[in-house]
Swiss-Prot record:
Induction: By abscisic acid (ABA) and salt stress. This is Calcium-dependent protein kinase 21. One of its GO terms (molecular function) is calcium/calmodulin-dependent protein kinase activity. The keyword DNA repair does not apply. Belongs to the protein kinase superfamily. Ser/Thr protein kinase family. CDPK subfamily. A lipid is attached at G2 (N-myristoyl glycine). The gene is CPK21. The active site is at D224 (proton acceptor). Ca(2+) 1 binds at D414, D416, N418, H420, E425. It is found in: Membrane. One of its GO terms (cellular component) is plasma membrane. Residues 36-50 have a biased composition (Basic and acidic residues). Residues 364-394 are annotated as: Autoinhibitory domain.
Length: 565
């Protein structure tokens, strides 16, 4: 799989063990609660934004979301084709019924939170409502801040504009209507332009850092900066680059520290894994993007999530990879200072913008970085598209929650009926249920899942971890994704089927085949597809619950010597 830098998979040893039991870590306890109008742990999803009046709220940095009806919403907006799908929602192209203006609509469906007996349905629904309110409040604040700026390197258009937000009175789903970005992804634009130089990278990167500075100056940590979250507004040569997704973002105040392990594997700062972080994590993630812009691959790479996390914690940056030896000293200095493992000495976003490499971006070397970098970026982008399609199918097929079964299992395993499962009760209960697991691994999982730190699991913790592991441990979802691509049912994903999903870019298709088609027969078998999905970062991170659980477990194991109790 050599060059497949965006693959999703897991440590086979850990995956094999975890798949035998019904445990994974639940959403962590909220942190820095006072800094946010809702709890830290947003589940809002719906992926990208690709491609006033009535019953909706428009603009304003408030958390109230007005209600509407399906008929009323349909009178105002015409929904079109699907643009992206996540675990809890879907993004579609839409248009203003009155003006015909092209827009995007991200619909976050009502997420039924796990509600064991002591948690009322009303309380669970309220928690979900707070989740969505935070995403809406952040988008409103950032839309307002961006539109009021004017001028500057990124001008006033660095953040996708939220037009309206409203909740369906019948099913509780929330519609976020926002501007449509049709200019394509960052890496696609770079590849299409042909000539790609350090100067071009500097001008692109200045916009990215300007977005980070805009977030931080408005009390927002993005927490999920990555190339896929930046789109061009339109196809014009001077189109603005916009950040599109605030689903994991949080409000913060100076001095706030967060503990929730969130983000995407390659872009995660070391202090996130250590469970104590602030806005500096966005600068780290932007530094990872800069490294990729300069050489086409991530600075911290591994065959699975654990190795990626280990590489991040080691912090060793390879400046010998072509073409980095030929890149200017200023560019490499900026990478080093943004990827400083110590957040207290890492540059701030404001300091990054004042760095000589960005202040003099227009005079940076205009010599091509070489075809190898463009090829790597093309490969990175093509594989992301292929993977994203597959993960969208997985998201569509995630099963409903089987809460009652796990509540009954909890009470059966709780021998002393004190409302908590001890290590001994877990070991005995798993053995009785035909799921014997070595004690050291049970200890590790218990520690990771025990959100209140009392050394046991209560019913809420047990049910949450059980349900989300069951969702993501079944490979039938991979089979469903494979069948989605295999339109003719031949048992192979063939060239025409790849073109239909990835687009007509022959070079991109060849890059996918080069990495995935291991027997070189010009098509992708299920075994090859499965191998692609199970190497690199864990494909199950498509579930934000699993992602939090996965990296929380890794952080506790890899950083146990530095974590505070």
């Amino acid at each position: 799989m050599g060059g497949c830098y965006s693959a999703y998979a897991s440590s086979r040893k850990l995956r094999g063990r975890i798949s035998k039991i019904s445990l994974v870590i639940p959403d962590p306890v909220p942190d820095a609660e006072a800094a946010s109008p809702r709890k830290d742990g947003v589940d809002g999803d719906g992926d990208d934004v690709r491609g006033g009046g009535g019953g909706c709220d428009d603009g304003g940095d408030v958390v109230a979301i007005a209600t509407t009806t399906a008929d009323e919403f349909a009178r105002r907006y015409v929904l079109g084709k699907e643009l992206g799908r996540g675990e809890f929602g879907v993004t579609r192209r839409c248009s203003d019924a009155a003006t015909g203006e092209a827009l995007a609509c991200k619909t976050i469906r009502k997420h039924r939170r796990l509600a064991p007996p002591r948690v009322t349905a009303a309380k669970a629904a309220a928690a979900h409502g707070e989740d969505v309110k935070r995403e809406v409040a952040i988008m409103r604040r950032m839309s307002s801040a961006s539109s009021s700026r004017g001028g500057g390197a990124a001008s006033s258009a660095a953040v996708v504009r939220l037009r309206e937000a409203c909740e369906d009175a019948a099913d509780g789903s929330v519609h976020l209507v926002m501007e449509l970005c049709e200019g394509g992804e960052l890496f696609d634009r770079i590849v299409a332009r042909g000539h790609y130089s350090e100067r071009a990278a500097a001008n692109i990167f200045r916009t990215i850092v300007d977005v980070v500075q805009l977030c931080h100056s408005n009390g927002v940590i993005h927490r999920d900066l990555k190339p896929e979250n930046f789109l061009f507004a339109n196809k014009s040569e001077d189109s603005p680059l916009k950040v599109i997704d605030f689903g994991l973002s949080v409000f913060f105040k100076p001095g706030d520290r967060f503990t929730e392990v969130v983000g995407s594997a390659y872009y995660m700062a070391p202090e996130v894994l250590r469970r104590s972080y602030g806005p500096e994590v966005d600068v780290w993630s932007a530094g990872v993007i800069l490294y990729i812009l300069l050489c086409g691959v991530p600075p911290f790479w591994g065959d699975n999530d654990e190795k990626i996390a280990q590489a991040i914690l080691r912090g060793a940056i390879d400046f010998n990879r072509e073409p980095l030896p030929r890149v200017s000293a200023n560019a490499k200095d900026l990478v080093r200072r943004m990827l400083d493992p110590n957040p207290s000495t890492r540059l701030t976003a404001k300091q990054v913008l004042e760095h000589p490499w960005l202040k003099n971006a227009d005079t940076a070397p205009n010599v091509s970085l070489g075809d190898a970098v463009r090829a790597r970026l093309q490969q990175f982008s093509a594989m992301n598209k292929f993977k994203k399609k597959a993960l969208g199918v997985v998201a569509r097929n995630l099963p409903g929650e089987e809460v009652d079964k796990y509540v009954q299992m909890f009470h059966h395993m709780d021998k002393d009926k004190n409302g908590h499962l001890s290590l001994d009760e877990l070991l005995e209960g798993l053995h009785i249920n035909g799921q014997p697991v070595p004690e050291p691994e049970i200890r590790m999982l218990l520690e990771a899942a025990d959100t209140d730190g009392n050394g046991t699991l209560d019913c809420d913790e047990f049910v949450t971890v059980s349900v989300h592991l069951k969702k993501m441990s079944n490979d039938e979802y991979l089979a469903a994704a494979f069948n989605y691509f295999d339109k003719d049912g031949s048992g192979f994903i063939e060239l025409d089927e790849l073109r239909e999903e990835v687009g007509p870019n022959e070079q991109a298709i060849l890059e996918i085949l080069r990495d995935v088609d291991t027997d070189k027969d010009g098509r992708i078998s299920y075994q090859e597809f499965e191998l692609m999905m199970k190497s690199g970062a864990d494909w199950r991170n498509a579930s934000r619950h699993f992602s939090r659980a996965n990296f929380s477990t890794l952080s506790r194991r890899l950083c146990k010597d530095t974590l505070t109790p």
